[in-house]
Amino acid sequence: MKELDWANLPFGYMKTDYNVRIYYRNEQWGELEVCSEETIPMHMAATCLHYGQEAFEGLKAFRGKDGKVRIFRLEENAARLQSTCRGILMPELSTERFKEAILKVVKLNERFIPPYESGASLYIRPLLVGTGAQVRSEE
C-alpha cells in the first residue's frame, strides 16, 4: 500500500479501496454491496444516457483534532438527493439507507481521510443513475 502525500493531493478523481452500491430492482432498494470495481455496467438504452436520469450529491469527511471522523451535513445531503429524485421521477433512497451507505464507504476508505493538520478532507460523491433500458417516443 502506497503512502499518501497529504501535502500534494490532486483535485480530482483518485481511486480509493472501495465503493458501495445499492440497486433498485422490482420496485425496491436492495442490500448494500461493497465493491472495488471502478466501472458501472449499463445497457445502451439506460435512462441516464437518453434522458439524463441521474442525481448526485457531494459530502466531505474530515478528521477532527481528536482523531474522530466527522461527515459534514449528512442529513441535508440526503434530503437534497431525495428532492432531486422527486424532480426527475427516480425512486428515492431513504435517509437511513443513504446514511448507511455513506458511513460504510467512509469506514471502508478511512485511510484516505487526511490528518487534521492537513486541513483537507475525503470528498464523497453519492450518485444515483438510471440504468434501466427505456427509450420511448410520443406519437
Feature map (PLM): residue ranges:
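Conserved alpha/beta cores of soluble small-molecule-handling proteins
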Residues: 1-138
